[in-house]
Amino acid sequence: MKENNYLELIKNANVYAVAKKSSLDHAVLISSKLNNTVLLKREDKQRTFSFKVRGAFNKINQLSTKELENGVICSSAGNHAQGVALASKINKNSAKVVMPITSPSIKIDAVKSLGAEVILHGDNYDEAFTKAKEIEKKESSVFIHPFDDPYVIAGQGTIAKEIIEEFEGDLDAIFVPIGGGGLISGIASYVKESGKNIKIIGVEPEDSASMKLALKAGKPVTLDHVGIFADGVAVRKVGEETFNLCKKYVDDIITVNTDEICAAIQSIYEDTRSIVEPAGALSVAGINQYVLKNNESGKTFVGINCGANVNFDRLRHIAERSAVGKKSEVLLAVEINEEPGSFKKFCESIGKRNITEFNYRYSDKASARVFVGISLDGRSDDKKNIISQIKDSGYIVYDLSDNEMAKLHVRHMVGGRTSIVGEHIFRFEFPERPGALLDFLNSIGQDWNISLFHYRNHGSDFGRILAGIQADPEQMNLLNEHLAQLGYRYWEETSNKAYSMFLG
């Protein structure tokens, strides 16, 4: 299929039997804060709370009766699965959906409620995809690709058509989340082939920037690791077709971190009173970063709110991280003298500021350590001023605002330091499913003494553990070999300042 057919494919796409023309809402608070007009394309309002139903239905609608005799099959952890299930229900064809075992129950139940058969297999999308392709071959069903298909791309492209038709003024840029590239390929194709002078800017998480890496390499490449916080865009390798379209039409791709995504979720909530999923907040996170880095003002930007399928129990983690992402909170570790009145004196050095978190623990006869969170007033130099103010009062201060171990674990563990010979600290990620914690402990084995352990379920696809393991110097090679064989992603954090100050 020729690339120049996409404009017509999008114009002729059949999506409105299952999708609605989502609203283009003015984000008043975000616009005011950024001194630009920001419009939100509310795909989170679709029946399945995601744009994915557009492409799924358009693809299925192109299939003949004979092709649909054995039904359709797809692999997905959530949004595409619901799109295929709903499209199949409307089209009255059978559907099977292979989902990872780690998929949230809310998404599994949603797919089942739409009449599709759910097959749980594997710990991640790649394993589910392999299983789906096996079933496709065995049963002669039709595989509905989540992004690398012309009709799927065209279905997603109808979003751009709606934006152009609804907004009568000049648009400067459309910010689009990128996973496999289907959404941005459709939007970019329609905008550019229509001759519109509108920038198309993709937004990816820093830890799953598969399209940015592909464009840099000149071809789709496979990521060694995919971050799973923004699970809706956690794709290890982009498609061939989507890569070609992005290479031709996309003006820029920027990446954002977890804290920026959480801050964007909060910003969208404050403007709309709606909670989007992490992937759904990517575009706003991108707009915020783009405006601040380029000092933009007076422009008009559109952000695609691509989905709202977020587990309720993830909101605690999102709320904790959003303050740092919005630069509205600083996390500090402070050493103070251990003497009568020193704690009160330290509090006075902070002044009349809003304290968001305060953990204090006796360390030894000479000193104590404080883990403190302090609200910022929004000025770019406020964090610097706070740190200088505390240092000027004679305290040693360490900024932990960007310290992943401190934010995930240590803030919940402040309770006293101890000296354990040969203790080494490691941070682990493992697929979150029933029994996963016990599986992790069994895999560590009984040959190593665990001296510290902290696990917290963030309501995501992966669990996170901080563990202390004792090993003599001559045992370190053996320990590293053992950990490498476990198959879990891990980082050594023994030299992390948060550990040495509060736990080590």
Predicted regions span which residues?
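PLP-dependent amino-acid enzyme catalytic core
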Residues: M1-A436, F440-G504
